[in-house]
Design a protein with these regions (language model features):
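Bacterial N-terminal signal peptides
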Residues: 14-20
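Functional surface patches built around histidine and acidic residues
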Residues: 2-10, 21-154
């Protein structure tokens, strides 16, 4: 979990991210996960009286790049470089008043990714935060573990 307010704080707050090792269920699941993660995130938001997040393709490309960098070992698992990702989104899409990021790692399905985030107070704050857009990306490492990134903005 990482959240940046209007002043884009530089403090990095980890919410106790632990690897979630859950097996995927059959071929094709990997390609569907972005939509499934969005579905589960928005279902939680709806159950809390919040508006759904809109999936943004540019934010998803930024999230995918971060997941690829973590999977390749170019950057460690976590939120390193979050400020640069938000600047990149800001440059492309205009001013951002609020931003956050959730990451996860392991072979898992979308339901388990979101359930893990919802069981972590910091990640849950992002899912239920004051955001309107989201980007979701994932990548596999050489061992087959999947790295997930979800970026939230307003």
């Amino acid at each position: 979990m990482f959240n940046i307010n209007r002043k884009i704080r530089k403090a990095i707050l980890f919410a106790g991210t632990l690897p979630f090792i859950i097996s995927m269920h059959g071929p094709g699941r990997f390609e569907e996960m972005e939509k499934e993660i969005l579905h589960f995130v928005n279902a939680d938001r709806k159950s809390n009286g919040l508006k759904p997040l809109e999936l943004n393709s540019f934010e998803s490309s930024v999230a995918m790049e971060h997941s690829q960098n973590m999977a390749s070992g170019k950057t460690p698992f976590g939120h390193k470089g979050m400020e640069a990702r938000i600047r990149k989104i800001n440059k492309e899409m205009g001013p951002i008043s609020n931003a956050g990021e959730n990451v996860a790692v392991g072979q898992m399905n979308a339901s388990e990714v979101v359930r893990g985030w919802l069981n972590s107070p910091g990640h849950k704050r992002n899912i239920e935060g004051d955001f309107t857009l989201t980007g979701i990306g994932y990548a596999k490492d050489k061992k087959g573990e999947i790295y997930f990134t979800e970026i939230f903005t307003k």
